[in-house]
Amino acid sequence: MIHHYSIAAREPARVAGVIAELWRGRAMPFPPVGEGSWAALAADGRNSMVEVYALGSELRPAEGDADARCVVNPQAPRFTATHAAIATPLAQDEVFAIAAREGWEAKYRKRGGLFGVIEVWLENSTLIEVLTEEMQQEYVNLKPPPGP
């Protein structure tokens, strides 16, 4: 179970707001880690959350008995391998409408012919795979490959 994960964005408040909308949740400032950070909270009863930091933010270990610290790298790459699949109660057309409103690329894909996702490219650089209720069922019903 993943309770939260973090991504970086040029406009953290905007990106957190869109993720919250996909979840029918809410977005709020989240300053504990980095200045200008926001969080999208799902209305799922489990406090699922996506933390959205300023572009270039890097979490680094702190010395001694201290929390990880956030440092901004001005040379941050535009694209990364980091992505997540998130569930939404919205219909496909609603997800596409949100992406279109924001000016972000979105398209339906069938992963390996097994389950569908809507690729939503936040700020046209960070991938989230959005699964509607039908797609969630396809994903949950996957049979794991046989073990060794």
Residue ranges with predicted function:
Residues 2-10, 41-42, 63-93, 118-120:
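Vicinal oxygen chelate
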Residues 7-58, 97-112, 122, 144-147:
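Core segments of cupin and vicinal oxygen chelate
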Residues 53-67, 127-135:
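Amphipathic N-proximal alpha-helical interface segments
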Residues 117, 121-148:
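Acidic, proline/glycine-rich low-complexity IDRs
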